[in-house]
């Protein structure tokens, strides 16, 4: 949900549901072509998004602000729940290919792991998610020999985004 209301001169006030007001402010500023200090983002309350409203709510906020700037009237955008579920990104899918080295006693001596991550049509928060997955690739094991590679894959699907765990669950072995 986003409600954009024109202020004085080119100022814009946007009430939106976001976990990252600064990113929404930057997005609205860029779309309207106005300085960041002319954009005010207000968030009444936020909870339960688990990362899902960190970046993707900026699109709705910017769209409402653009319509409000063009019409010089307040504009509210509220997506139907099923539309919101289709448009909003989900947890990143990963595909793994690996080779594990084991000694004669059954101890893991090393791993060679490739992680391919479906990012979607734009990067969004994919670099951070992939970085976190790579950091968790060895999980709780001491592995004397490790090679981890991560590949963010651009696809024709909706952009995936932050989601509870932010790459850690995908990266754990």
Report residues per predicted region.
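Structural alpha/beta core scaffold segments of enzyme domains
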Residues: 1-173
